[in-house]
Amino acid sequence: MINLDDKNNIGRVIPVSDIVLLPGMYHTLKFNKFSETQIESLSDEDIVNIALPLKQNFGQSKLKEEDFHRVGVTFQVNAIEKTEKGYKAEIKILDRVEIKTFSIEEDSIKAEFEFAPDIIDLTEKSKDEMVEYIKKVTREISENFKGSEKFMLAVEGQKDLNKLMGYLSHFMQISSEEKYDLLETQSLKDRGLKFIDYLLKQKESLKLQFELAEKFTEKANKNYRETVLREQLKAIQEELNEGKSSPSKKDKNYLNRIEEAQMPDEIKEVALEELGKLESQSPNSAEYNVIKNYLELLIQLPWKKQEFKDIDLEEARRILDEQHYGLEKVKDRIIQHLAVMQLKNDKKGSILLLVGPPGVGKTSLGKSIAEALNRKYVRLSLGGVRDEAEIRGHRRTYVGAMPGRIIQSIKKAGEINPVMVLDEVDKLMASYNGDPASALLEVLDPEQNDTFTDHYLDVPYDLSNVFFIATANSLDTIPRPLLDRMEVIQISSYTMNEKFHIGKNHLISAVLEEHGLNDTQLVIEDAALERIISEYTLEAGVRGLKKQIATIARIASEKIVSNKVELPFKVKEDDLEDLLGRKVSSHDKAQDDNVPGVVTGLAWTSVGGEILFIEATGMLGSGQIVLTGQLGDVMKESAQISLSLLKSRLPINAINFRERDIHIHVPSGSVPKDGPSAGIALFTALASLVTGIKVDSKLAMTGEITLRGAVLPIGGLKEKLLGAQRAGITKVLIPKDNVVDLNEVPQEVKEQLTIIAVETVEDVLRETLGISLPRIEHIFNPNKFIEGTFKPAEE
């Protein structure tokens, strides 16, 4: 038995029915069967009162545990008033609770409970917006009723979301179950959305009632009478147990289509149920079109399982080679992935993530994979999508609801196993409408997506047969749980030679066809094409190159149509300034000569690799280090490490750093720069400054340094070496741990560069300044140093 004297989680249950009680509300309860003693005990602060909803109104019958719902609210009594039939009490709702056990006695019901407070998943701003929206809809409803001004004054005075919902629920025609559903919903956001849904249904219902009443008063509306008669006929048939009449020709057509769709049994059952609803509706009713559209979606979706077809790897390789020049490592990865699918005889879809700069062929690779697999190809552009409903669809209760884009794409493909490209997945955005990236977790999880449930479809759909290919420019903005579900394939920027072959063998012919030209009318010479690539584009891919070729094609088209040129119209290198204007490329070039303190570093940007000049100079001052060029925190720390390492390792006692300022600048000051890979370049620039030894202007370097003088590996080596080769660099220092990454670098680039691996700053200074550092044990013994001199590097 429960001891009511135990004040921990024990309370007295007051049964209530057909009302909504939410925390923070004030309400009046009637107690027609309570004795005076029982009424007085309601105000006892030592007893917890719990208002607990009944599942239905049981009248005089004795209540049992199963008659109650499990979620209720505690309340305090503010005032009690005697009435003709009993008592009424003004109460304030305190907390939401969940009942664990009951103890039902002759004159009281007690229960053990635990608190289940609301989940506040709305910001104050969102709550205020939801309150204002509810008031707005209520105003629109009240305009149809005379004398509603007093009611609206009470509504406008409500500021709390729970209080407003509880107050309005007394005037709404919603079922007891729907009222209890509001209380049972713990999320404040979900409760508000459900209430708005009920309110909008109420609005539409009242609107229809007023319209029908008006039409019926003016004239016995045929459609209205038909609706009433249909409902009456349906009720009579159910009462007489006659069932439905024989199906019409239209219904037989739907039955045949449902059979032909080869749905799973549970889906077929849903479709037949919807068909039954459709038969009972008037074609002119709003519900008729909602049911019809849903039924059409069920029928048109592909349900039939596809047999796994053998993959012709040679044909797949041929298609990839034919449609994409270069990218050998990427194509190898794709072919290997297809080979694994073939060996496993795996019908389940795969999930690849192609990551790389814009214009390198990520989306078109997905199309080629679809062709290689002989599957349908569909593409979803997800850039800027911020509504979860775009992925999961809208619930059918909303006006204008539709399925999510995943289900729409499957319907468009007409097959259950298409290749689906999710483009720009890194540009999904979260908002108050939900997080689309989180919605994609179910779509891209092989353990879950065989029962993916779209909100509109509302039945499980098997996505496990779909071959998903996502594309992104960067991994940084992709949530980690989503990234874990995909196999990442990096696509690097193209080399100059690759761009030339792509332009010559693919882009020129494609652009000519788009502009109605052929190779007998327009010819772009090789030298001109090379110059377009080097001076009129600044990109990792070839999208800008295609635009420049298209510009030339448009100019040529105008000249050819006007008979202003002889055919073929040849574009030479010297013609480019007249056709394309001033060159737009701003790639830095290696300098012819350097001064002490200037070093060439290497950077990796979204459009490929670049060289980066680092300049250092000294002056009289107070020992400060000045850093300019819009450097990030990591790069500033690299400069501090370089200076500390310089002071500790070089024999420079002749320089008093307390009386000298050092200024380090990285040109292109409007461009933000960050990262640790400029460490050895910063160190070398400072060493060059204090020793007065120049660094070869054709030498560039990249690598992170530590206070121990170690050179650590960096990222983006391929792009950096491509940028060095393009800028005219002939010698590059890289970290020793990055030597393995040279396998990713095209052979043509490696042949034009002398690449030297370095492991410590001693190696760096030996290659750049031709000096060696003293042994590390001499660092704190300046007497061992020869002031102002350096030991030449050993051969």
Swiss-Prot record:
Induction: By heat shock. It comes from the Bacteria. The keyword DNA-binding does not apply. SMART domains: AAA, LON. Keywords: ATP-binding, Cytoplasm, Hydrolase, Nucleotide-binding, Protease, Serine protease, Stress response. InterPro entries: AAA+_ATPase, ATPase_AAA_core, Lon_bac, Lon_bac/euk-typ, Lon_lid, Lon_proteolytic, Lon_Prtase, Lon_prtase_N. It is an enzyme of class 3 (hydrolase). One of its GO terms (cellular component) is cytoplasm. Residues 593-771 form the Lon proteolytic domain. Disulfide bonds: none annotated. GO terms for molecular function: ATP binding; ATP hydrolysis activity; ATP-dependent peptidase activity; sequence-specific DNA binding; serine-type endopeptidase activity. It is found in: Cytoplasm. Residues 11-203 form the Lon N-terminal domain. CDD domains: RecA-like_Lon (cd19500). Pfam families: AAA, Lon_C, Lon_lid, LON_substr_bdg. Its EC number is 3.4.21.53. Coiled coil: none annotated. SUPFAM superfamilies: P-loop containing nucleoside triphosphate hydrolases, PUA domain-like, Ribosomal protein S5 domain 2-like. One of its GO terms (biological process) is cellular response to heat. The active site is at 677, 720. Homohexamer. Organized in a ring with a central cavity. PANTHER family: ATP DEPENDENT LON PROTEASE FAMILY MEMBER. NCBIfam families: lon. Belongs to the peptidase S16 family. This is Lon protease. It comes from Clostridium beijerinckii (strain ATCC 51743 / NCIMB 8052). The lineage of its organism: Bacteria, Bacillati, Bacillota, Clostridia, Eubacteriales. The gene is lon.
